[in-house]
Each structure stands twice: as structure tokens, then as C-alpha cells.
């Protein structure tokens, strides 16, 4: 009897261990299958990887910022910071009412009109010199899963179908809130060329874009787009990654030189010396589009903090400023409308020419 009991206990223990191992194996397989979906893109390979490895900005197996940059700046461990970020409650994190927005028929805007339309967060359309430039369009999902990073009520006015034919798509880095797989796939046949930092082109090639349509640049490289149009790829202080391995593609800001406009496309990034260097190298910037929102003291080196926004605009010597990266998603622990107050303060207290349009409002570009 005791012998049978011992056998049963051993069998039960083995069953429990077997079940645990089976669950772990199932979870591992599920994660592998999940991160191998097309939307996660692909890390550089072949000739592109060779070019990446030759970049002066790629060292010790990853792209680096110009100066040492910690992702988390506090003394606490990363797990502690993530735990607080997930569970700390903030009043006003999301708006109680729908965000004000305007539905503009973009296809009816004449090609010769010099305008900009912001779609919330970091998505906007620039039209200048008869060219249409679409920056970081995110109209479907800002994360790998639909239930994370849900847009605020009222901000989902625009879809890929609302976009006119696009001459140039500009992507500053490959994070999900700047590079939306479903959006770019739906726009694929209506985009002339893609402008992106080194390594990001691998995602687009994987998603079916012809290599000839990819203008993939390292920092301080440029490309002639058309007569009177030049794009300069410039530094930013940030990081990259859609998969488990970070910093395998570059992040960047861009300077667009058009016949009647000089526009700085800031992307994401913390304050550093590159802003003053860009301002000196490219005098007469007509419009600087800067990050404002989704910041946190924990990430103060990789996102532009409010206390540095006015100084950044001055460093760039920009005639006008538009702030983005806000009013659509809650990706950091601050009130949803705090970035709007930051912009108002830059305008009123710092006496800067700051544009504060509603989502979908047509903004005239000064010639």
C-alpha cells in the first residue's frame, strides 16, 4: 500500500512538473510566433547590415548617441521604474471629453498651397513646393496589440484612405508610435519614396517596398529629392527597436530644404548639443517641429523635457515652432493636456512664435 502511495506521489509530481514545462514551452512558442509577425519588421541583413556596421554611429553591436545616454536616469532598477509606470495613477491622464479635431478633406487642397496639417501625436502632412511629405503616419495601431496605446476619443478622425498621394514618407525611427505597419502597408502604392534613417529600410523592404524607393541615410548624409528639394539626415538623442534587440537601426531628425521653406523635423529625442549645431549649420529655419509630450524624469535624456523646449527652439533659431508627440496617446505619466500648456507657456512666457493648431486644422506655411 505504501509502495503504491509512493509511486502515485512520484507520478503526480512528474505530472505537475510536466504541466509546468508544457506551459513554459507553450508560452515560449507563443512569444516567438508573436514577435515574428510581419508587423515587427526585420533587423538589417546582407548589404544593409554591411553598411550599418561601417557606420561611425554603430559601435559594439548597436547604434549609439553622440554622447553617453542612459535610458533610465534614476538610481532605481529598471523593473522598479517599469512597475511604477504601469501602476502609478495620474489624474487627467486621458481626457474625459473628446479631443477637439477638424476633419479636413485633404484631397481638395491644391498642390500649390503651402500648408501643414497635424493629425495628433507625431503624424503630419507637409505640402510645399508642389510636393506632399507625410511624416510618421499612425492611423491604425501605435503598439503591437490593439488594446495598448489606444487613441483618445475624438482623435481617430483620419485613416490611410483620407491621405492624398504622397511624394515622400518620412520616418524618424522605428518605434511603434512612429512607424505603423498597417498604415504604411495601406499607403504603399500611393507613396513615391520613403526617407528613413539607416537600418529602418529593412522593415520597408520586408514589407514589400522596392529598394529603389528607399532613401536611407546615416547622420550628416543628405539626398537631392527633386529640383529645389534637399533632405538632410541629422542627429537625435533617442533609441530604436521594434523587437527584443534594441538599437539595430538608427534614429534621426531631418532638415527639409524646399524652394520656399526650411523645415526641421525633430522626431523624438532629448536635449543635447546637436540642436545648436544644427541651428548654426542651417541658418534661417522657417519652422521647427519639436517633441512635446510623453516625457518623464526617468527618461530625461531620451525625450525632450519641458524645461528644455524653449532653449531648443532658440538653439535652432527657428522662426516658428510646432510641437507634436501629444494629444492622442497616453505614453507617459503626465496629464494629457500638459503639453498644450507647455506650448502656451513657450508662446506667452518665452515670447516664441509657437503654433498651436487643432488636430486636422490647415496651417499656412509662411513664404
Residue ranges, per PLM feature:
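Cap/insert and terminal regions of metallo-dependent hydrolase folds
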Residues: 16, 27-47, 51-54, 58, ...
Amino acid at each position: 500500500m505504501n509502495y503504491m502511495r509512493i509511486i502515485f506521489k512520484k507520478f503526480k509530481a512528474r505530472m505537475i512538473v510536466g504541466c509546468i514545462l508544457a506551459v513554459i514551452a507553450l508560452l515560449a512558442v507563443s512569444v516567438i510566433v508573436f514577435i515574428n509577425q510581419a508587423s515587427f519588421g526585420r533587423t538589417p541583413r546582407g548589404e544593409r547590415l554591411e553598411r550599418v556596421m561601417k557606420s561611425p554611429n554603430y559601435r559594439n553591436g548597436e547604434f549609439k548617441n553622440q554622447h553617453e545616454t542612459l535610458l533610465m536616469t534614476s538610481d532605481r532598477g529598471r523593473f522598479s521604474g517599469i512597475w511604477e509606470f504601469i501602476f502609478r495613477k495620474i489624474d487627467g491622464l486621458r481626457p474625459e471629453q473628446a479631443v477637439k479635431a477638424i476633419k479636413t478633406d485633404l484631397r481638395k487642397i491644391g498642390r500649390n498651397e503651402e500648408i501643414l496639417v497635424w493629425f495628433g501625436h507625431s503624424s503630419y502632412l507637409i505640402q510645399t513646393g508642389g510636393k506632399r511629405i507625410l511624416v510618421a503616419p499612425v492611423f491604425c495601431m501605435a503598439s503591437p496589440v490593439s488594446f495598448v496605446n489606444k487613441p483618445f476619443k475624438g482623435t481617430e478622425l483620419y485613416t490611410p484612405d483620407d491621405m492624398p498621394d504622397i511624394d515622400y514618407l518620412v520616418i524618424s525611427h522605428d518605434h511603434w508610435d512612429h512607424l505603423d505597419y498597417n498604415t504604411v502597408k495601406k499607403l504603399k502604392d500611393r507613396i513615391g519614396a520613403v526617407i528613413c534613417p539607416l537600418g529602418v529600410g529593412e522593415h520597408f523592404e520586408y514589407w514589400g517596398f522596392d529598394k529603389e524607393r528607399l532613401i536611407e541615410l546615416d547622420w550628416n548624409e543628405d539626398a537631392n529629392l527633386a529640383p529645389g528639394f534637399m533632405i538632410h539626415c541629422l542627429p537625435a538623442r533617442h533609441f530604436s527597436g521594434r523587437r527584443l534587440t534594441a538599437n539595430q537601426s538608427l534614429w534621426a531628425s531631418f532638415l527639409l530644404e524646399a524652394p520656399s521653406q526650411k523645415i526641421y523635423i525633430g522626431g523624438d529625442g532629448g536635449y543635447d548639443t546637436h540642436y545648436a549645431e544644427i541651428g548654426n549649420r542651417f541658418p534661417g529655419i522657417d519652422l521647427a517641429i519639436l517633441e512635446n509630450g510623453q516625457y518623464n524624469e526617468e527618461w530625461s535624456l531620451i525625450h525632450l523635457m519641458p524645461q528644455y523646449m524653449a532653449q531648443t527652439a532658440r538653439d535652432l533659431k527657428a522662426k516658428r515652432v510646432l510641437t507634436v508627440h501629444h494629444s492622442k496617446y497616453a505614453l507617459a505619466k503626465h496629464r494629457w493636456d500638459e503639453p498644450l500648456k507647455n506650448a502656451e507657456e513657450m508662446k506667452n512666457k518665452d515670447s516664441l512664435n509657437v503654433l498651436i493648431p487643432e488636430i486636422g486644422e490647415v496651417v499656412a506655411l509662411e513664404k
